[in-house]
């Protein structure tokens, strides 16, 4: 039984990069309610309006469980609700760990998290590493690993044409500071005979200057999977992560995974066992060169990890247990 069989409503906000057809990605049983005043950046007037908006939504639908996702919703929600209804919060990467913010702002984010952590709410992290950070803020913390929908992904893979291709390294996502396009470019420059593909687009595309890099632009899901299927190595040099779905999907597709040594990545990838965890440019280069040899044992290990731990069936079962335990207290 999936969560959609029981938990039916979701309040959400739209970002600039949200696709126009975003509703198509949700199970039809889920009733979506837009929080119109919710925004990612700090805006006192809109944040106060969002505070009252979510309280109004809560009063109207009378939920059995409230689950807040990401820092902004976590702050507003934990202040807005009194904890009489079982409440959970998932950071998806703490803001105070994000290196694109200045130190003073990161300290402010940590103070906000520390204050909100005192509310009657359980933090459910999406990886072991994030859970360890949560325990520094509150003892009311647990974790459920992110997971992928294997059946949905396999259906797309089965319809995807596999073609002859040169040895190819790819990544997927927005070309932004977090995803570290500068390091991606340095690695590509160090391996001029290897083809690199960035599936996606973004404001920092100008940093991808190496001649052996192809930028696909924004692609729909089936197109993105087609690029991935016809590649060999998944490269994720991020500055920080929660627990990236793109990594889990690449593991399922039996791609050799080469990732940066940050929370989320290193929780899933164990160096030399099911992928490579790297810090310096030369580490990434060496790992990619190794991937041109025999890596079947490594990729099979990663694939088995997805089957056992990082899929939506396991994830839904764990969330359901936590929700039901909280409701029965």
Could you describe each region identified by the protein language model?
Residues 2-7:
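Short, small-residue-biased leader/transition segments that mark boundaries at the very start
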Residues 239:
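Aromatic "clamp/platform" in nucleotide-sugar-dependent glycosyltransferases that forms part
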Residues 256-259:
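Short hydrophobic beta-strand element within catalytic cores of glycosyltransferases
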Residues 270-282, 289-293:
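Conserved acidic donor-binding segment of nucleotide-sugar-dependent glycosyltransferases
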Residues 162-179, 185-189:
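Conserved donor-binding/catalytic core segment of Leloir-type glycosyltransferases
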Residues 52-56, 106-123:
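Membrane-proximal helix-turn-helix segments that form the acceptor-binding/catalytic region
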Residues 58, 218, 226-231:
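Short alpha-helical donor nucleotide-sugar binding micro-motif in glycosyltransferases
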Residues 31-34, 114-157:
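Donor nucleotide-sugar binding/catalytic pocket of nucleotide-sugar-dependent glycosyltransferases
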């Amino acid at each position: 039984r999936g969560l959609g069989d029981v938990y039916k409503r979701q309040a959400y906000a739209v970002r600039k990069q949200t696709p126009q057809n975003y509703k198509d990605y949700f199970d039809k049983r889920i009733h979506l309610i837009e929080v119109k005043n919710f925004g990612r950046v700090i805006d006192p007037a809109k944040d106060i309006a969002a505070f009252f908006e979510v309280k109004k939504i809560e009063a109207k639908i009378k939920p059995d469980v409230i689950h807040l996702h990401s820092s902004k919703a976590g702050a507003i929600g934990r202040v807005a609700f009194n904890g009489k209804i079982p409440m959970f919060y998932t950071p998806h990467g703490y803001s105070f760990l994000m290196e694109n913010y200045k130190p003073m702002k990161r300290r402010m984010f940590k103070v906000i998290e520390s204050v909100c952590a005192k509310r009657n709410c359980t933090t459910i992290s999406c990886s072991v590493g994030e859970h360890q950070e949560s325990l520094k803020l509150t003892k009311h913390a647990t974790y459920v690993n992110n997971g992928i929908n294997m059946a949905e992904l396999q259906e797309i893979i089965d319809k995807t044409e596999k073609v002859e291709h040169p040895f190819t390294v790819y990544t997927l996502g927005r070309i932004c500071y977090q995803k570290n396009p500068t390091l991606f470019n340095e690695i590509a420059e160090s391996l001029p005979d290897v083809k690199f593909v960035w599936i996606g687009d973004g404001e920092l595309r100008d940093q991808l200057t190496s001649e052996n890099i192809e930028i696909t632009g924004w692609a729909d899901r089936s197109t993105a999977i087609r690029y991935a299927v016809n590649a060999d190595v998944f490269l994720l040099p991020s500055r920080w992560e929660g627990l990236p779905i793109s990594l889990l999907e690449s593991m399922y597709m039996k791609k050799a995974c080469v990732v940066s040594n940050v929370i989320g990545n290193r929780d899933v990838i164990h160096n030399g066992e099911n992928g490579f965890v790297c810090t310096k440019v030369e580490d990434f280069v060496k790992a990619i060169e190794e991937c041109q040899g025999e890596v079947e044992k490594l990729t099979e290990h990663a694939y088995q990890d997805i089957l056992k731990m990082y899929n939506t069936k396991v994830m839904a079962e764990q969330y359901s247990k936590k929700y039901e335990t909280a409701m029965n207290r």
